[in-house]
Amino acid sequence: RQDTGPGRRMSLYDVRLAEEIYVIPAYAEPHCVIVSGSEELQVMQWGLIPRTAKPEDAQRYDRENLFKNARAETLFEKWPWRMLWQHNRCIIPVTGFFEPHRLSNGKAQYYYTTLKDQDLFSIAGLWDEWTHPQSGEKVLSFVLITTEANAMMRKIHNGGGNPFRMPKILTSEQ
């Protein structure tokens, strides 16, 4: 039987991953490996900084975690998603994701969610490249696309500013 685990698949692209990487929004600069339309792996910052952002806005977007998620239902209507969905789509390879569950005392308990029969799967995303106008520094960043939660995830992701959401998990055909 051929090994088809995440380590094998990532080795095909000569990418080395840490044994365990946990990424939670609002914590120190998480980065992920992203597959963009060119089938090329890139390391990008999670939390989109739109290419049109002024330097002071770029810092605020990063600091306040404003663009971590984009609703699939509004991709074609809202800025900055509408300028990215056609040419700046990406695939975010993951082994799982965290979702918060609001307890009766208002605190959040995080659940790590995986797929039953796949140790590596993909989440849909959008990406952009921002260039600092004075220094020329380039920042590649991305946002996860979210959709309405399925029945299981509704029980978990039940509160906060965007309840009943989950990442848009791609099928192998997509």
Residue ranges and their predicted role:
Residues 1-174:
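Short linear sequence motif anchored by a di-proline
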